[in-house]
Amino acid sequence: DADLAAVYRAVASLADETVRTMAIPLLSTGTFAGGKDRVLQSLNHLFTALDTTDVDVTIYCRDKSWEKKIQEAIDMRTATELLDDDTTVMKELTRVHPDSCLVGRSGFSTVDGRLHSYLEGTRFHQTAVDVAERPTLWPRREEANEQITHYVLGESMEAIRTKCPVDDTDSSAPPCTVPCLCRYAMTPERVHRLRAAQVKQFTVCSSFPLPKYKIPGVQRVACSAVMLFNHDVPALVSPRKYREPSISSESSSSGLSVFDLDIGSDSEYEPMEPVQPEPLIDLAVVEETAPVRLERVAPVAAPRRARATPFTLEQRVVAPVPAPRTMPVRPPRRKKAATRTPERISFGDLDAECMAIINDDLTFGDFGAGEFERLTSAXLDRAGAYIFSSDTGPGHLQQRSVRQTRLADCVAEDVHEERVFAPKCDKEKERLLLLQMQMAPTEANKSRYQSRKVENMKAEVIDRLLGGAKLFVTPTTDCRYVTHKHPKPMYSTSVAFYLSSAKTAVAACNEFLSRNYPTVTSYQITDEYDAYLDMVDGSESCLDRAAFCPSKLRSFPKKHSYHRAEIRSAVPSPFQNTLQNVLAAATKRNCNVTQMRELPTLDSAVFNVECFKKYACNNDYWDEFAQKPIRLTTENITSYVTRLKGPKAAALFAKTYDLKPLQEVPMDRFVVDMKRDVKVTPGTKHTEERPKVQVIQAAEPLATAYLCGIHRELVRRLNAVLLPNVHTLFDMSAEDFDAIISEHFRPGDAVLETDIASFDKSQDDSLAYTGLMLLEDLGVDQPLLELIEASFGEITSTHLPTGTRFKFGAMMKSGMFLTLFVNTMLNMTIASRVLEERLTNSKCAAFIGDDNIVHGVKSDKLLAERCAAWMNMEVKIIDAVMCERPPYFCGGFIVFDQVTGTCCRVADPLKRLFKLGKPLPAEDKQDEDRRRALADEAQRWNRVGIQADLEAAMNSRYEVEGIRNVITALTTLSRNYHNFRHLRGPVIDLYGGPK
């Protein structure tokens, strides 16, 4: 709306003394209106803008109904209202909103009067003065409006003034009394009433512009009654002065003269007295200062240099344009002669060739079959309808949900592969963007350069990988899959409560911890002596060798600075990469568990696969998978690299320099690497014993780079072959998961959870064979399967101090590219073996990695023993009950929403609280992202329908009380960045040499 008004104002600015006529179509209508009727909206902006000029305007339109609307609007504006002699016009009239309590009182009107007033003499005067002060403190309208919302929610004027970054401000101007005509108009009166009612949440419409980010307590709706006028008061335009009629000499040229223009009044009425123009208020009754006449269709004069002198718009006519696309344009008919002989102006003479061109058929180009209907019927009403993209990366707003439908029931749909646009290498553009960034080092230029640089890297990596895998790259035949989409989940309203101070919020969290975990809050880490002094940079510690550079040995550790954590959960900072820690990790965490089983290895594996297919799968696809194997293709390597984010693409670019071909990559080589982060579990364990070092057995980087391309196809095939009630969480958002589970979990329903101890280590030979057989059945091509098989199975190694050679059994290596996928398949296989028909008949079962839940199943005495005897797995079984002991899955609780009657998953607030007590490196810059993530979770915790369930969940799992106070505190801390910074204490410097 604002852009449309600005365009018309720009057109009006082109008028000067030499431009007396304009021919203009209505902008943003027809095909360009986005499926909406914008005729009157566009027309009103045209009136408002061109009222400041002195031109005669011809409006072109092709639609008869539009012509009628436009003519009626012009007639309404040019109509003259006759007033009685004894009528008194009230000059001090203030226009107010139709819903105002001031309607009908002396000095106030709903159709006429001033639009800006302090509302003196009313109880809303002080509020109007306060509202008017905002634009002087914050010139940007969005920022000023945001402060008004804070004022409504109870913030004092003094507090708002202290937030202003400057000391000196101008005097205020009266606020607008009618910003729009809908029920949510933010008039001074409504602001006063909302503030007096001490509301915690209120609604504003789109006529009250706010910043893009979410403001707590403020809901936004589209304005249902926009005021279609420009808030800026038009400049004063003196009335047009008409010259005395005189006979002008005819053109002496021998050519044809076309389109003569009449200047002068054709009206029989005398002009009225000039009236100073007022801001356009009501389109129904407007006094015109000039006589009315109709004129002929006039051509548009050639563009001339614009001048700034404004004129008043006085005459308009609607001239219909022929509707067909190819039709001879006839010269317009002459109108009846005027009462006075007009002055004739000739626009120049045209030769015969130009006349022939003018009289020819005009052809605008025809639409293809169905093209026009498709353009006009395109529904562009949802978020993401308009996709903006940079010159490199993919379009924004195109991340669509893959598991949800807008229908009310579950539907089956074909799976369509998402189209990926391969990156193109353009070194010249990268060089130019680098120069541009060096000359003007702004954030925007830096971002453009980095985008192009990453794009070039990706293009080069794709070429390298395709070259290295050329023996394996073959064309493939696609399978047709069906997926099930679920209705979009419903959530109850989120009502947030905030504490007045962030310091109070931190104190509330610490008080909760001290009451429930007294040993945690009393625990102190002695910073100065917490690390060994054998710091080594650049060490490499593998299972059978260790290497470091002697020149990098130091007598004291590097300097280490971090913010002290204000929340006293005593979580240690990340492990330092010292030789001591790395070797401790390598020696303590590298052995698999003992294998004990009854069936022979291969028999057990075959039985596993048969149970998986019988109890967890349909039988629609296995034959097709065998006929259409999964191979490495150009498309899936391209797709994998294209989706990589910048840092990972740069790392892969470095690793693929001078790369080996795929057939020479050692698939069985794994390097032990240490996870630096400490695993956080709510409780006191981390204070009672030294935190365990987690280890990644990192596969050869090139093995991952070459073979990751087949992962998406494997996921698609697995999801297609599973029963409709069995789900994996691959490629799924939290909202997608809520959509899947929302209808199935009801209060009192039994839910089976299993917690498998040391899942990766416990996988023996039979489970390794099971994984390989399932990969083969899903259609992985034989050459690729041989490569993958080398990374399963046993590894031979050497004990460094003694030189003893030993073998690892077939444990799962956490750094292999298929670890999560195979773990999920084996998890479902274990459930199929021990539950059998109970899994098939369950309403809903979900699996990811070693985590699972199965609805409607209660455990029996044999369940854990079967897992141990048949599958070599030590399993802890939890019988959860909805609403009494809510189930725990993927780091969150599945709770029932009492308002919507559906269930959803919410994150574990206690785990979140413990994580906030982790020390943060001093140079960290990610706090705003952390705050935003915490704010999203806080919004979910504050849903009104899940409060009772969340309390029950925390009580049953952790036996803690008062989690509501913690949620209020976390909501307060996540409210803004200023609050969130209260989690970070002063910077502490460790080491760095003798003191």
From Swiss-Prot:
Please report the name of this protein according to its UniProt entry: Polyprotein nsP1234
Q: Which InterPro entries match?
A: DNA/RNA_pol_sf (IPR043502), Macro_dom-like (IPR043472), nsP3_ZBD (IPR048891), RNA-dep_RNA_pol_alsuvir (IPR001788), RNA-dir_pol_PSvirus (IPR007094), SAM-dependent_MTases_sf (IPR029063), Togaviridae_RdRp (IPR047311)
Q: Which organism is it from?
A: Middelburg virus
EC number(s): the record gives 3.1.3.84, 2.7.7.19, 2.7.7.48
Domain RdRp catalytic residue range list = 749-864
Q: Which residues take part in binding Zn(2+)?
A: 180, 182, 205, 223
Which CDD domains does the UniProt record give? Togaviridae_RdRp
**Which keywords describe this protein according to UniProt?**
Host cytoplasmic vesicle, Host membrane, Hydrolase, Membrane, Metal-binding, Nucleotide-binding, Nucleotidyltransferase, RNA-binding, RNA-directed RNA polymerase, Transferase, Ubl conjugation, Viral RNA replication, Zinc
Any keyword Chaperone?
no
